[in-house]
Amino acid sequence: MRLCLTACILAAFASTAALAQPSDPRLKNSYTFQKDGWTYIHLEGTPSEIGFQHGYLLATQIADNLQTIELENTHEAGKPWPYFRAIAHNQIMPRIEPEYRAELQGIADGVQAAGQNIDILDIVALNAHLEVSDYYIPWLLKQQGKTSPAALVAPGRCSAFIATGAATKDGKIVIAHSNWSAYMEGERWTTVFDIVPAKGNHILMDGSPGLIHSGDDFGVNSAGIMITETTLPMFQGWNPSGIPEFIRARKAMQYANNIDQFVALMREGNNGGYANSWLVGDRKTNEIAYLELGLKHTPLSRKTTGYFVSANFPVNPDLIRDDTPGFDTHDMKSTMNARHVRAEEFVQQHLGQLDTALAEQYLSDHYDSYDHKVVAARRSLCGHEDVSKDPEPAWDSPPFSPSGAVTGKVMDASMAEHMSFTARAGHPCGEDFLAAPFLAAHPEFNWQAHVLHDMKAGPWSTFTISQHKTL
């Protein structure tokens, strides 16, 4: 698969897969369907079986997603796709444990069985793209005494909170997250994965075609562990002998039975890639935690009552100094600090009443705490960078960048007990993004034209494990 994907492949992406599948025994118990802008997929079996099901059932979506990530990475890094495949082979694959290597190979086998020219190096590069492009490559170029392209910088694009005890309406955990990304990426980040692995916990998480981890990291497992994160902006550092972040994130989602285990799995072999502030809750104990997973510092805070908000701002002074040295805590014009202020305001305003309905409002909020007015732009919790005339220097985002909040997800402890969450594809506020008028007004982004589509918001929809389209 390369940038020359045909129009028929892209057209096939829009079709709804039937529940009845071919007779290949590896596809047993797997299925997929479309609902309200989301692709739901149920995967079940051994690692290689889960991978094959994923690759076969989502083959056209994986090809489309890979085309988009290839375009984005090669444009920003100024390197051809074989460069990223080489990194996947030399830096990433040797540090992938057998269980997940088998699943990744299974995805490649599945997409090939469905007729796509995609191999395991493409799949590994796709899974690792978040940590390779903005973390590994800048570190590598620095080691070589070279200057990194300005676009390759750890971003800060998500809004989230987790609350429990006296902070919530029923005294139990509520969690919320919006994925911020480039619209060409985010419009494809609309898959609900229902995974029943041979080992570990049952998983329900959102994600992107071809990824074995969530990527924007919102999900719940059958042990009652509720998980999300937002990225640490302007992060610097890499441990070349560490375990890829996407492996640690998937393993923690699958195997963590409590907060301590989640933290240990994320810290073990930390390579510094895709560094995040993790918000974690344990439905069984009603405890929540906030893990700032830097490379040199990984501070952890825990609460049985209260809340944590997160919008890409580091908190720990040592981490700010050593892991995110370019972050300015006093620049209130930046999206990270402005959203930090608004997140605190919103939660304090509704303290003691937080539930999933208010969580949806939080993710949809358009108040700009810097300009003190309601305006959907880069400083609102529901981000709309495409209408912002100002750049975001922290991650070299240009004026009118086609990026922002692309999905919203909410869940409470009762939903987690039944392994369910509510999600909206598109802007959490419900506004649509239309590609043609945007590109006409901003032709500097025409390099994205063949992959940038309309991103129309769907309704808030609830998804549950073992769900079928009729539910």
Predicted regions located by residue number:
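Bacterial N-terminal signal peptides
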Residues: 4-15
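N-terminal mature-domain region immediately after signal-peptide cleavage
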Residues: 19-260, 267-272, 279-302, 335-471
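Extended amphipathic alpha-helical segments with heptad-repeat/coiled-coil character used for oligomerization
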Residues: 287-330
